[in-house]
């Protein structure tokens, strides 16, 4: 009887051990599966952020060209208005008034980062250094947008002040096709021939200089985010190579 009972207990213990081993194996397989899934998600998210960074770089390079053109135009106009030798009908003067009009802003692409943060998946990034670098970039990203809003509001303010002296419509209307053209005629610099021009000229120059300053400030913050985007893109590329 005792031998049968002993055998029964040994058999039961053996069964329990086998069940436990089976559970542990299943848990291990599940753990491997989850890790593999998370690794794949991490890679896909990082590739997505890299794609967004490339879009940022392309957009910023376009802004740099526009910034340079406008800064050159402001400089030309300030120098021309400070000179007594330039004629009101100068084509160079008209061209630079054209190119000096308007302002732009950095929009950027942050959809992948926003998806990661809103879904709580930012911790899928296993490298703390890389994760913190990404967070730091997008903090700067948001700060650049805020600063550009400020600079653009200043540019608009000083542009509006100059519009009271300059026939702005004569520069704007020719940009429209025949259907929407207001027929204001060719761009007019007649304001330079008015009797009070010498009194208002310093105000126009000051406003142009302030517009130029805010444009340069906007350009400088764009350079900051551009450099950070290049650095972060390279960091992601190196990390993805190491993951292979």
Where do the model's predicted regions map?
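Long, hydrophobic alpha-helical segments that serve as membrane-spanning/inserting helices
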Residues: 1-6, 10, 31-244
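Hydrophobic membrane-insertion alpha-helices, especially the h-region
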Residues: 13-28
């Amino acid at each position: 009887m005792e031998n049968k009972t002993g055998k029964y207990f040994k058999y039961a213990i053996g069964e329990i051990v086998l069940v436990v081993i089976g559970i542990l194996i299943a848990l291990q397989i599940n753990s491997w599966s989850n890790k593999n899934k998370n690794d794949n998600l991490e890679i896909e998210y990082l590739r997505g952020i890299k794609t967004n960074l490339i879009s940022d770089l392309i957009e910023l390079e376009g802004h740099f060209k526009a910034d340079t053109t406008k800064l050159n135009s402001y400089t030309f106009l300030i120098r021309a208005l400070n000179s007594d030798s330039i004629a009101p009908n100068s084509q160079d003067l008209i061209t630079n008034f054209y190119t000096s009009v308007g302002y732009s802003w950095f929009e950027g692409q942050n959809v992948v980062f926003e998806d990661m943060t809103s879904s709580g998946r930012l911790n899928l990034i296993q490298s703390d250094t890389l994760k913190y670098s990404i967070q730091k970039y997008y903090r700067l990203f948001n700060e650049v947008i805020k600063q550009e809003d400020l600079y653009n509001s200043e540019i608009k303010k000083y542009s509006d002040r100059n519009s009271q002296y300059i026939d702005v419509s004569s520069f704007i209307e020719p940009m429209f096709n025949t259907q929407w053209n207001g027929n204001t005629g060719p761009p007019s610099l007649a304001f330079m021939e008015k009797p009070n021009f010498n009194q208002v000229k310093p105000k126009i120059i000051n406003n142009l200089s302030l517009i130029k300053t805010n444009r340069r400030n906007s350009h400088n913050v764009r350079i900051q985010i551009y450099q950070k985007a290049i650095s972060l893109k390279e960091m992601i590329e190196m990390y993805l190579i190491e993951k292979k």
